[in-house]
Amino acid sequence: MRPVLNILFALGAALAAADSHAYCVRNALADRAVHAAVVASKMPAPAKTFSETVAAGKEFCCNPKNADCNPDRAGDAATVVFDAQVEAADAQAKTAQPPVKCGAPDPKEQNRVVAIAPVRGFLRFEANARFDARRRPGGDNPPFLLKALTADNKVVTTYSCPPHGVSETPHS
């Protein structure tokens, strides 16, 4: 019995440590998938970086010590830049529901939208409780929000999906 308890304790400790040392992309949407991809600022950009689609109600975590997750090798107190968007949940709906970008206009690159999150934090996609379905979706009436949070769940920034000043999503 004692070896089993030791194994369970070790597994629990490993799981707890994994979450505290990773950033996570959380999808709190019930009917949409989300996609986040790390944007490397150093050139040349690495051949492979974090780029994941997360299903509705799921999350995906990545350890920033992994070069794919943190190509700029930012320290624990730094931030990571992402391309982020809300997508249709399945392939058939993708034509009816085009992706909705999340974030703020990138000052370094025209026509690009980025979201910034702590290296040891979270990106959480969620429905906007203040969305008015009677109005056209857009930067002033976003159907979705993307929140950047610290490891202890403090909101750092809230981004609209779509962002202010970026072309609006079609009404579906």
Map each language-model feature to its residues.
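Intrinsically disordered, low-complexity segments enriched in small/polar residues
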Residues: 18-172
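Bacterial N-terminal signal peptides
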Residues: 6-16
